[in-house]
């Protein structure tokens, strides 16, 4: 019997996913919502921010997989059926995220924004490099992606601390945990990398008070979700100089609105939510295995708890 997986994403092309998944699961057909016909037995969904009412059209679903590591876009939906929801946990996604974080941290550690500005001005500008061990990097969020990034930064020689909601232990990382540890963690972070999931507890966690706790001139990198940071407070801190710069891959509203002040701030680098994306050739294996598990009556791996948001 042939089953159907419905694929819904406004930013991901379906063809690579269709090819990868149908090669692994010959009895599953991958279809977009527009391709679904009366004879399709839709049992699985692979989605990224599907439109309102999407799930109500597919009452026989047995598994929903999110095209990414974050589940916040599905929290609170009234059309989501009572079926397992799984996130992607792909080594290639973790590697891609780590590369982006390393790029952003190295750019600040080696004073590249100052050299970029000097070049635009036609001015020779020397800043003596600091040793990596002298530069204090803080990774806010030590989950799968945050932990991998923190370990790579430590391997590169940076002085790395991490903060998480519950205690973690990572080799070479100065780990902090819980609300009382947040301000001391921020106070030692010259470069702050935000890697938290978006939950009710983390929404705007980095507001004016948290930003004020960072050292003056600190740099901020956000690769989590835009709403973890109070955007107005962020803009104010960048304008005042309390924050020396920001590398932002995520925003409260995406795409970032035309005319938003972040577009024209000289100390801000904007990228369009691409720090890490799912790679069909590698991630399809996890999706196929989870479909096999659900068929056999087992829970999928990397299941999301929507009450927590991750």
Model-derived regions: residue spans:
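Phosphate/diphosphate ligand-binding glycine-rich loop within oxidoreductases
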Residues: 43-116
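Phosphate-coordination loops involved in phosphoryl transfer and adenosine-cofactor binding
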Residues: 2, 82, 133-136, 217
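Glycine-rich, N-terminal phosphate-binding loop of Rossmann-like dinucleotide-binding domains
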Residues: 49, 68, 194-197, 223-224, ...
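C-terminal helix-to-coil terminal segments
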Residues: 84-88, 92-100, 114, 169, ...
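Short acidic low-complexity segments
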Residues: 29-41, 52-55, 173-188
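Rossmann-like adenosine-cofactor binding region
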Residues: 166-261
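N-terminal glycine-/charge-rich "phosphate-binding" loop or analogous flexible N-terminal tail
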Residues: 1-43
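Glycine-rich NAD(P)-binding loop of Rossmann-like domains
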Residues: 116-148, 175
């Amino acid at each position: 019997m042939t089953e159907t997986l419905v694929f819904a994403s406004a930013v991901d092309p379906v063809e690579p996913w269709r090819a990868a998944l149908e090669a692994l699961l010959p009895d599953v057909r991958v279809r977009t919502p527009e391709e679904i016909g009366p004879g399709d037995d839709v049992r699985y969904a692979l989605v990224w921010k599907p439109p309102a009412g999407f799930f109500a059209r597919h009452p026989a679903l047995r598994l929903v997989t999110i095209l990414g590591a974050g589940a916040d876009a599905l929290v609170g939906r009234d059309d989501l059926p009572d079926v397992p929801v799984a996130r992607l946990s792909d080594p290639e996604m973790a590697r891609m995220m780590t590369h982006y974080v390393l790029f952003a941290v190295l750019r600040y550690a080696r004073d590249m924004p100052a050299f970029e500005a000097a070049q635009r001005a036609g001015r020779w500008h020397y800043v003596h490099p600091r040793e990596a061990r002298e530069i204090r990097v803080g990774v806010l969020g030590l989950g799968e992606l945050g932990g991998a990034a923190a370990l790579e930064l430590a391997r590169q020689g940076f002085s790395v601390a991490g903060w998480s909601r519950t205690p973690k232990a990572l080799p070479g990382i100065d780990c902090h945990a819980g609300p009382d540890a947040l301000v001391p963690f921020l106070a030692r972070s010259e470069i702050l990398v935000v890697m938290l999931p978006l939950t009710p507890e983390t929404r705007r966690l980095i507001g004016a008070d948290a930003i004020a706790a960072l050292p003056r001139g600190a740099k901020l990198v956000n690769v989590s979700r835009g709403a973890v940071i109070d955007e107005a407070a962020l803009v104010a801190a960048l304008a005042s100089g309390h924050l020396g710069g920001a590398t932002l891959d995520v925003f409260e509203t995406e795409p970032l609105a035309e005319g938003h002040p972040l577009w024209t701030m000289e100390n801000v680098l904007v990228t369009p939510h691409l720090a890490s994306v799912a790679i069909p050739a590698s991630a399809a294996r996890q999706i196929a295995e989870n479909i096999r598990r659900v068929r056999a009556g087992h829970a999928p791996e990397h299941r999301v708890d929507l009450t927590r948001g991750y």
